[in-house]
């Protein structure tokens, strides 16, 4: 009861002044580390405070060195994995702050630990900013910012709103869906979602690469799902949310929109929003949103309808979802992540952020156009969001082999299934996206160059395949080790690195890097 009362107080507490939290300074600063004066009262034999306040390079040079290597990789490479991004320095400062020290099971105003005054302020501010970022009325929408990542967030929703073995429909994984929506093969339930719930996929029309909404509606009529997921991890087109809403209404099913990949684009208003149609919306917070690694669950609240008897019916999602997150499936929230998310959500309402997301879209369109002109087949023929899915079958090579060559030349992309694949172990495609490199300042002409590098890598992969003594990936990797091939890889890697190094790093300064060569 106390938890429910506290949750109802969130909207009013969100309006309280927050000056005490910031106190005119920074949430986190290396210069705020204690000086030697702090240790004037140290007790005999109590030596650990000095160690606890020593910098990373002193305490653990091995980990410090690994971090420096990762900085160099990010600086010298081309990051094309669409689920990745470079989060801001300010977000990383918040995530690396003292907010990591506090346990706070429960919700603002209803914690199971004391000392959470400022944790409550940060979480309440994060919730307020989440609603503002997506232009939502707090009387009609609520949000939980405690989920640790996207897959748990989806499972929280299923646990809250469904009974065991209720039915879920979602986009098939080989057609661009996600494991957290439930996936099983003919012989095995791969995702835990498919163990605890009954799942049925809808698919793309393989001739067009678009979702087959007609077949989805027919399947839903037969399957009678309790929940339908509108969301994907490798679908380059916009969802027809209105069409899925219509199917949900017909089946009296809950509509869950998983906007994990596209939430940054939605926040900036450069693509249609699912909030006009969905009952519940989930998202991760790192991908196009460019925050820390976490997740959010948005849910409708307030008046749902007036029934035939003239009685008002209200949404009952809020308490169910909050209780599924805690205490149902999680304990203490990650307060440092929530604090960093609050910073990212503030950034998401700026003019710079909107301009960034517009550039993400322009870059994706240019990338797709250049790839098509270079003879590549794209699933659905193009893109309407931040990613492209390349079908490599007309090149006579699979995604696993191309991914190996791309990685060797410092281009990060991922192999991906495409319609018509018979094995997830030998996927026919490569998935690539524009958010990360756009964060570094890449524009259209740069993505034309990236497409050129990709084309060279694919041609090299085809050559290596021709020289391999077998058809398996291990045979391909062995063929990559020849001196002639290594020479070609080295040249392409050099060209990629020299191009990438021209652009700004995000979250750290080039001048402070240990490995610059």
UniProtKB/Swiss-Prot annotation:
Disulfide bonds listed in the record: none
GO function terms (MF aspect): glycine hydroxymethyltransferase activity; pyridoxal phosphate binding
Main location: mitochondrion
GO biological process: glycine biosynthetic process from serine; tetrahydrofolate interconversion
Keywords: Mitochondrion, One-carbon metabolism, Pyridoxal phosphate, Transferase, Transit peptide
Cofactor(s) named in the record: pyridoxal 5'-phosphate
EC number: 2.1.2.1
Cellular compartment(s): Mitochondrion
Pathway linked to the protein: One-carbon metabolism; tetrahydrofolate interconversion
Enzyme class, UniProt record, top EC level: transferase
Residues the record lists as N6-(pyridoxal phosphate)lysine modifications: 287
Domain of life: Eukaryota
InterPro entries: PyrdxlP-dep_Trfase (IPR015424), PyrdxlP-dep_Trfase_major (IPR015421), PyrdxlP-dep_Trfase_small (IPR015422), Ser_HO-MeTrfase (IPR001085), Ser_HO-MeTrfase-like (IPR049943), Ser_HO-MeTrfase_PLP_BS (IPR019798), SHMT-like_dom (IPR039429)
Catalysed conversion reaction: (6R)-5,10-methylene-5,6,7,8-tetrahydrofolate + glycine + H2O = (6S)-5,6,7,8-tetrahydrofolate + L-serine
One Pfam family hit: SHMT
Annotated Gene3D superfamilies: Aspartate Aminotransferase, domain 1, Type I PLP-dependent aspartate aminotransferase-like (Major domain)
Cited function: Catalyzes the interconversion of serine and glycine.
Subunit composition and interactions: Homotetramer.
Record family assignment: Belongs to the SHMT family.
PANTHER family, A to Z: SERINE HYDROXYMETHYLTRANSFERASE, SERINE HYDROXYMETHYLTRANSFERASE, MITOCHONDRIAL
Protein name: Serine hydroxymethyltransferase 1, mitochondrial
The organism's taxonomic lineage, starting at the top: Eukaryota, Viridiplantae, Streptophyta, Embryophyta, Tracheophyta
């Amino acid at each position: 009861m106390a938890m429910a009362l506290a949750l109802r107080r969130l909207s009013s507490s969100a309006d309280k002044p927050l000056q005490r939290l910031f106190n005119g300074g920074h949430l986190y600063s290396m210069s705020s580390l204690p000086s030697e004066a702090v240790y004037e009262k140290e007790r005999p034999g109590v030596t650990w405070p000095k160690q606890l306040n020593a910098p990373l390079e002193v305490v653990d040079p091995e980990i410090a060195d690994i971090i420096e290597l990762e900085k160099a990789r990010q600086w010298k490479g081309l990051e094309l994995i669409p689920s990745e991004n470079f989060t801001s320095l300010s977000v990383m400062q918040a995530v690396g702050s003292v907010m990591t020290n506090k346990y706070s099971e429960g919700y603002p105003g209803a914690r199971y630990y004391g000392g959470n005054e400022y944790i409550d302020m940060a979480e309440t501010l994060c919730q307020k900013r989440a609603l503002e970022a997506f232009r939502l009325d707090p009387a009609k929408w609520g949000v939980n910012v405690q989920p640790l990542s996207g897959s748990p967030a989806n499972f929280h929703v299923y646990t809250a709103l469904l009974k065991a073995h209720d039915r879920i429909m979602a986009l098939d994984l080989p057609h661009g869906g996600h494991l957290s929506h439930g996936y099983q093969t003919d012989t095995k339930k791969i995702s835990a979602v498919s163990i605890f719930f009954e799942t049925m996929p809808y698919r793309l029309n393989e001739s067009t690469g678009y979702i087959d909404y007609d077949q989805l509606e027919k399947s839903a009529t037969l399957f009678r799902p309790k929940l339908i997921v509108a969301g994907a991890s490798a679908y380059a087109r916009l969802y027809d949310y209105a069409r899925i809403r219509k199917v949900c209404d017909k089946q009296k099913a809950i509509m869950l929109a998983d906007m994990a990949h596209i939430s940054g684009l939605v926040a900036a208003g450069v693509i249609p929003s699912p909030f006009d149609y969905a009952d519940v919306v989930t998202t991760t917070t790192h991908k196009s949103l460019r925050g820390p690694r976490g997740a959010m669950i948005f849910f409708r609240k307030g008046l749902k309808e007036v029934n035939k008897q003239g009685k008002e019916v209200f949404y009952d999602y809020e308490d169910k979802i909050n209780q599924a997150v805690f205490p149902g499936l999680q304990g203490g929230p990650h307060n440092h992540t929530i604090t960093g998310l609050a910073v990212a959500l503030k950034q998401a309402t700026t003019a710079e952020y909107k301009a960034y997301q517009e550039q993400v879209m322009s870059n994706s369109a240019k990338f797709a156009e250049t790839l098509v002109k270079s003879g590549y087949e794209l699933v659905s023929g193009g893109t309407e969001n931040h990613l492209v899915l390349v079908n490599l079958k007309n090149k006579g090579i699979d995604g696993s082999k191309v991914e190996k060559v791309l990685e060797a030349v410092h281009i990060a992309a991922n192999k991906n299934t495409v319609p018509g694949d018979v094995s997830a172990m030998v996927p026919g495609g490569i998935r690539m996206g524009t958010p990360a490199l756009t964060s570094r300042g890449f524009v259209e002409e740069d993505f034309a160059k990236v497409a050129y590098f990709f084309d060279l890598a694919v041609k090299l992969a085809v050559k290596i395949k021709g020289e391999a003594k077998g058809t398996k990936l291990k045979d391909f990797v062995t063929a990559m080790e020849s001196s002639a091939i290594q020479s070609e890889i080295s040249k392409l890697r050099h060209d990629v690195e020299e191009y990438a190094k021209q652009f700004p790093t995000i979250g750290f300064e080039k001048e402070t890097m240990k490995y610059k060569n």
